């Protein structure tokens, strides 16, 4: 079972990725983790990637695709894998296809931007401990204060509305063409495209996924 996950930041992708991994016994392949591991191990591709990163440039699709090919040849990917954060562009999707990596399911989590902004902008953090709260879904006992220490809670830079909206714009610009691309692939019978309502309860979304992939 080879799966690609698509969904905006804050759409609940990470939570459902965990569920799919545990339910179907397949590893999650994150390009960031792979890059770090290859650089640490000093592999040929890792050395190439390090040179590019040290020069302050973006790692090329060829290097990333090479890493993915190496990674999915490992024993734990025998039953399949979950690709998270890749592909992000049409050339990357084409690259996977050219390498003969067929994808069984493309899963999209659909959540309106305003809902994501509300989810993210409502987050509050106690930085010293890493504890997080949400003004609506998981409020602290005393507004603006950490439950344990009583210290002030803050809004992280990443959770501020303007930051969230900027990230969403990037996501839509990059991913809208991919959604269309995989829609066409599905229409041609080359993959299955599944879209889930990410505004439902986490357990409901998980149940919907389990049913669709059964």
Swiss-Prot record:
Spell out the residue ranges making up region: LID.
Answer: 122-159
UniProt cross-references to Pfam families, sorted A to Z: ADK, ADK_lid
Enzyme Commission number(s) from the entry:
2.7.4.3
Q: Which UniProt keywords apply?
A: ATP-binding, Cytoplasm, Kinase, Nucleotide biosynthesis, Nucleotide-binding, Transferase
Q: Where is this region: NMP?
A: 30-59
Query: Which terms does the record give in the GO molecular function aspect?
Result: adenylate kinase activity; ATP binding; nucleoside diphosphate kinase activity
UniProt: ATP binding residues: 10-15, 123, 132-133, 200
Record note on quaternary structure: Monomer.
Q: What does this protein do?
A: Catalyzes the reversible transfer of the terminal phosphate group between ATP and AMP. Plays an important role in cellular energy homeostasis and in adenine nucleotide metabolism.
User: Per UniProt, what is the name of the gene that codes for the protein in this document?
Assistant: adk
Name under which the protein is recorded: Adenylate kinase
Concerning HAMAP family, the annotation shows: Adenylate_kinase_Adk
């Amino acid at each position: 079972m080879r799966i690609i996950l698509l969904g905006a930041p804050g759409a609940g992708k990470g939570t459902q990725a965990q569920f799919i991994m545990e339910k179907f016994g397949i590893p999650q392949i994150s390009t960031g983790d792979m890059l770090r591991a290859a650089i640490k191990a000093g592999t040929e591709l890792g050395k190439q990637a390090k040179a590019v990163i040290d020069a302050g440039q973006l790692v090329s699709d060829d290097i990333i695709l090479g890493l993915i090919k190496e990674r999915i040849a490992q024993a734990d990917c025998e039953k399949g894998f979950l690709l998270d954060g890749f592909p992000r562009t049409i050339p990357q999707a084409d690259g996977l296809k050219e390498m003969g990596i067929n994808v069984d399911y493309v899963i999209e989590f659909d959540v309106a931007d305003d809902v994501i902004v509300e989810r993210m902008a409502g987050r509050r953090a106690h930085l010293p401990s890493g504890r997080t709260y949400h003004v609506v879904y998981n409020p602290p006992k005393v507004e603006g204060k950490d439950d344990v220490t009583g210290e002030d809670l803050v809004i992280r830079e990443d959770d501020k509305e303007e930051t969230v909206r900027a990230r969403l714009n990037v996501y839509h610009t990059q991913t809208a063409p991919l959604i269309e691309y995989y829609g066409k692939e599905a229409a041609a019978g080359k993959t299955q495209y599944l879209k889930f309502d990410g505004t439902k309860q986490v357990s409901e979304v998980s149940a919907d996924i389990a049913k669709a992939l059964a």
